[in-house]
């Protein structure tokens, strides 16, 4: 139905829309360093790391690339190094996710942008294979 060039143009447009929504919803700071590496505000923010890694995989590898290559905390020289642990150590449980939205949070705080951006990411990855 669509030729390759049309798919590429639509994918590039989706990339910019999803990038803007991700910046708004997860607080990512996309700054180009001289070597072209992007970084985020906090490497300890697991939500930002997951969204950023997922988006980078879809945008640059069609969802097939290894996540660690595009992990900003993996790429940035200022990233904290993980603590050394025995090989059979069980990782600590993640903190529970908040179940309610704080009072006053609304559109200005990026409400709903995460859902839209995740839908765009899923659509763009599906679109690559059709």
Swiss-Prot record:
Domain of life: Eukaryota
Signal sequence, start to end: 1-20
Keywords: Signal
Keyword hit for Signal: yes
Keyword Signal found: yes
Additional remarks: Almost completely overlaps SFL1.
Protein's UniProt name: Putative uncharacterized protein YOR139C
Organism: Saccharomyces cerevisiae (strain ATCC 204508 / S288c)
Source species taxonomy: Eukaryota, Fungi, Dikarya, Ascomycota, Saccharomycotina
């Amino acid at each position: 139905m669509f030729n390759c060039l049309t798919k590429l143009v639509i994918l590039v447009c989706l990339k910019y829309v999803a990038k803007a929504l991700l910046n708004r919803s997860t607080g990512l700071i996309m700054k180009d360093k001289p070597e072209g590496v992007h970084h985020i505000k906090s490497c300890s923010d697991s939500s930002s790391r997951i969204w950023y890694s997922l988006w980078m995989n879809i945008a640059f590898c069609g969802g097939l690339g290894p996540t660690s290559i595009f992990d900003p905390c993996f790429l940035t020289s200022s990233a904290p190094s993980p603590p050394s642990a025995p090989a059979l150590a069980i990782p600590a449980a993640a903190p529970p996710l908040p179940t309610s939205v704080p009072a006053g949070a609304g559109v200005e705080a990026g409400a709903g942008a995460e859902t839209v951006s995740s839908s765009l990411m899923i659509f763009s990855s599906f679109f690559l294979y059709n």
